[in-house]
């Protein structure tokens, strides 16, 4: 929330104050990050879009930094590899990625 004060006498310009505390800024930063991640999760394959979106909706906010880093690694992977890993056609060679893939697959729809 932004606050504006009445214009100073004779100046004609209003004084604008920023957010009242740093918490609002960090919330905005988290919201901006979430929007960017949601865009990166758009893979062009409905199934992958739904799986990644489900993770963002259900787990991202509470996820520890290490898990978030693994999720960001997954977003850098090629779609065809992700598809094979998520559908179980191929084993993911990275143990951390494989564990997160299993967790994402287990999330309720």
UniProtKB/Swiss-Prot annotation:
The keyword Repeat does not apply. GO terms for cellular component: cytoplasm. It is found in: Cytoplasm. GO terms for biological process: succinate metabolic process. It comes from the Bacteria. Keywords: Chaperone, Cytoplasm. SUPFAM superfamilies: YgfY-like (SSF109910). An FAD assembly protein, which accelerates covalent attachment of the cofactor into other proteins. Plays an essential role in the assembly of succinate dehydrogenase (SDH, respiratory complex II), an enzyme complex that is a component of both the tricarboxylic acid cycle and the electron transport chain, and which couples the oxidation of succinate to fumarate with the reduction of ubiquinone (coenzyme Q) to ubiquinol. Required for flavinylation (covalent attachment of FAD) of the flavoprotein subunit SdhA of SDH and other flavinylated proteins as well. Belongs to the SdhE FAD assembly factor family. This is FAD assembly factor SdhE. It comes from Xanthomonas axonopodis pv. citri (strain 306). The gene is sdhE.
């Amino acid at each position: 929330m932004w606050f504006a004060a009445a214009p100073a006498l004779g100046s004609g310009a209003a004084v604008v104050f920023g957010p009242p505390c740093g918490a609002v800024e960090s919330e905005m930063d988290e919201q901006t990050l979430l929007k960017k991640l949601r865009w990166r999760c758009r893979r062009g394959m409905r199934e992958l879009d739904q799986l990644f979106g489900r993770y963002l909706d259900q787990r991202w906010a509470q996820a520890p930094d290490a898990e978030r880093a693994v999720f960001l690694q997954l977003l850098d992977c090629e779609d065809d590899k992700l598809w094979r890993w998520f559908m179980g056609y191929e084993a993911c060679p990275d143990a951390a990625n494989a564990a997160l893939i299993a967790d994402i697959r287990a999330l309720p729809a």
